[in-house]
Amino acid sequence: MPSIDVVVAREILDSRGNPTVEVEVGLDDGSTGRAAVPSGASTGAFEAIELRDGDPSRYLGKGVEKAVLAVIEQIGPELVGYDATEQRLIDQAMFDLDATDNKGSLGANAILGVSLAVAHAASEASDLPLFRYLGGPNAHLLPVPMMNILNGGSHADSNVDIQEFMIAPIGAESFSEALRWGAEVYHTLKKVLKNKGLATGLGDEGGFAPNLGSNREALDLILEAIKEAGYTPGEQIALALDVAASEFYKDGSYAFEGKNRSAAEMTEYYAELVEAYPLVSIEDPLFEDDWDGWNTITAKLGDKVQLVGDDLFVTNPERLARGIEENSANALLVKVNQIGSLTETLDAVELAQRNGFKCMMSHRSGETEDVTIADLAVATNCGQIKTGAPARSERVAKYNQLLRIEEILDDAAVYAGRSAFPRFKG
């Protein structure tokens, strides 16, 4: 099999104008692979370490030259000669070279860039699309696009607490139809906001970011847009939230809608929302280390709605194993840069699926034109993907890749649709 011949890296810009790492891997048969690393705005405390330069004279301290040099001077020479298809061995070699628990020496952004670029090179050498190379012949499930069409929290300069208000086209017959429905609702929402004199500026992930009176108002506006676009809420298009509660948790309580609330009060609030709206999924409803609170909310709402651990699990198999053991959450958000390698990402997905947890493949708020997560969503048959609004090219690139994959699969393609959310009774 082809072996690694050269590894190069460079500093490029992400969708927020901040530097990130791009890596290219060349094999001795001429095959190449390239990958760019995303970056988050609301980051979990337990994520792998993203290496930044800290030099205020370059990119306000956010440069990634240290990570680039780590690839060129340390990782690359170590990996030359490795069989490119031995992904687990290659990733382990980088872990050993880094020799920390959180990838803080070489940087998760350096390690992940190489890890993904190797997979791209190996898939090219194997003459297979990435989703097929990683997922094998059973990779066939197209995910429900969880479109973040209204932004708040850390993703927008607005007074809305909840970070993401999403639509999920669960009633569509195909991914391409789901994408069309979502785009139509997105454009209709813009018209609804304009007619009410509300701002239509965009947040980091392409959703609108108006100042609203409450989080419920955001949900009501989206329901209005769904209906005005000609669709039935709950039957054709459902709603989903990313609360990102760790962002407004301080000193044991949640500063939410002008009040300090306990975990029990937040749980009651979510229970009211689940009764009032066609919600299929709530991500990070509580603080990332409030295991007791997560256990309580899962016991109360876990049979009615998907409860997704993002900051809670940070795509880390060890934290996920604790969540499974303690019945905390019932779904995993999958972000490759939280854990920092392809191998560990796939291990987390496998552990989740083996234990009855749903998985949602996810972008970050700081993205690039890299489309790897689209292939990963299909390779793992996870049935859900979160990659922003149907706007801004770094978001749309992933949706367009899924359209291509659907075309490649042809009659073998299955759209996850409503089956992705078995707990939803709406």
UniProtKB/Swiss-Prot annotation:
Q: Which GO terms describe its cellular component?
A: cell surface; extracellular region; phosphopyruvate hydratase complex
Keyword set, alphabetical order: Cytoplasm, Glycolysis, Lyase, Magnesium, Metal-binding, Secreted
Which SUPFAM superfamilies is this protein grouped with?
Answer: Enolase C-terminal domain-like (SSF51604), Enolase N-terminal domain-like (SSF54826)
Amino acids binding (2R)-2-phosphoglycerate:
Q163, K335, R364, S365, K386
Keyword Cytoplasm assigned to the entry: answer is yes
Domain of life (superkingdom): Bacteria
Which GO MF terms are attached to this record? magnesium ion binding; phosphopyruvate hydratase activity
Which GO biological-process labels does this protein carry?
glycolytic process
Name the Enzyme Commission number(s) assigned to this protein: 4.2.1.11
Co-factor binding details:
Binds a second Mg(2+) ion via substrate during catalysis.
* Pathway assigned to this chain's UniProt record: Carbohydrate degradation; glycolysis; pyruvate from D-glyceraldehyde 3-phosphate: step 4/5
Q: Which InterPro entries does the UniProt record give?
A: Enolase, Enolase-like_C_sf, Enolase-like_N, Enolase_C, Enolase_CS, Enolase_N
* Residues where Mg(2+) binds: D242, E283, D310
The active site of this protein is located at E205 (proton donor), K335 (proton acceptor)
Which class of enzymes does this protein belong to? lyase
Name the family the entry cites. Belongs to the enolase family.
State what protein this is by name.
Answer: Enolase 1
**What lineage is on file?**
Bacteria, Bacillati, Actinomycetota, Actinomycetes, Kitasatosporales
Query: Gene encoding it?
Result: eno1
